[in-house]
Amino acid sequence: MKIISKRRAMTIYRQYPASRIFRYCTGRYQWHGSVCHYTGKVVPDIPGVLAVYAERRQDRNGPYACLMSITLN
C-alpha cells in the first residue's frame, strides 16, 4: 500500500460511512517541508486499512509528520 494525499484519503473516508480515522503507527517522522516527500512511499499492508496519508503536526519540539489511516472498524 502506498501513502496517498490527504485529499484522496478524505474522499475514500466519505465513501465509506462506517470508516474511522486512526493513527497508522505511533512513530513521529521529521517534517521535510511538504507532504510530497511522503506520498508514494510504500507502507506495510494491514487488513481493514483502506488508505494511509501523512499529516503535519507540531509540538514544542517543532513540526513532525505522523501517518494516519482510514480503517473499516
Q: Where are the model-predicted features located?
A:
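N-terminal acidic leader/helix
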Residues: I3-R20
